[in-house]
């Protein structure tokens, strides 16, 4: 074979094996809109009150790990001040948030119908596979749906990546992954408490501004799921 190319083999049914044609992946997460978040990191020095708030919020986050596990994990990562990205636990979101699973299912229905329509119009004689990736779509968790994810992420984006295989008899199967992304930042307004300890967005914003806690990116993808 020619140097620099990927060899292709064929199986018993003459389908190509090896590396196929590239398809687009999910697009880069667009990030925050202007005005979100706490502004520049470490824009001022930390004073004693900041350190006292940091200590109290760390105690509060540790105390809420059983009731609000993902909210506590995300807050502790913020207070850890590394600024590194953190996995978003997309599988947990799909399991806990019917609205998210509903949006992903809607993506699947839309593109499955398109694949079935195209396959029928193409008069195919064998199975054919269609890949697709959606745009990032904005979502919002309501406290009434799940308080853990309300405090863990609030607003976020999702995208769905899928392959749909249509067979000659009109049946089909699909494999998909849900992708989620968010910027863990504080916009003000939220406040929650565990026992005597209350944690507010405004306090957390000041910790980022003073350089002893840091906003970061949340990114995640689900396991590959199959259907229907």
Predicted segments, located by residue:
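Low-complexity, glycine/serine/proline-rich disordered segments
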Residues: 1-106, 110-131, 135, 167-168, ...
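Sparse, context-dependent recognition of short Cys/His-centered cofactor- or disulfide-binding micro-motifs
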Residues: 144, 201-203
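Mature extracytoplasmic/lumenal regions of exported proteins
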Residues: 149-201
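Negatively charged, low-complexity tracts enriched in Asp/Glu with abundant Ser/Thr
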Residues: 130-147
């Amino acid at each position: 074979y020619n140097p620099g190319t990927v060899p292709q083999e064929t199986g018993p049914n003459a389908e190509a094996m090896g590396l196929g044609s590239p398809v687009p992946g999910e697009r880069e997460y667009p990030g925050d809109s202007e005005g979100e978040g706490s502004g520049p990191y470490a824009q001022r020095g930390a004073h004693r009150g900041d350190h006292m708030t940091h200590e109290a919020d760390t105690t509060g986050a540790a105390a809420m790990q059983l009731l609000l596990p993902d909210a506590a994990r995300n807050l502790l990562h913020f207070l850890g001040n590394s600024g590194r990205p953190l996995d978003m636990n997309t599988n947990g979101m799909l399991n806990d948030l019917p609205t998210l699973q509903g949006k992903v299912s809607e993506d699947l229905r839309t593109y499955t119908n398109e694949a079935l329509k195209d396959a029928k119009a193409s008069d195919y004689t064998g199975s054919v596979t269609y890949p697709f990736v959606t745009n990032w779509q904005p979502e919002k968790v309501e406290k009434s749906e799940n308080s853990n994810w309300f405090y863990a992420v609030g607003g976020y984006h999702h995208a769905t990546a899928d392959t749909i295989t249509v067979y000659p008899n009109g049946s089909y199967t699909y494999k998909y992954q849900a992708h989620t992304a968010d910027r863990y930042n504080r916009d003000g307004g939220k406040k929650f408490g565990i026992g005597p300890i209350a944690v507010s967005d405004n306090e957390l914003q000041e910790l980022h501004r003073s350089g002893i806690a840091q906003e970061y990116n949340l990114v995640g993808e689900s396991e590959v799921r199959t259907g229907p």
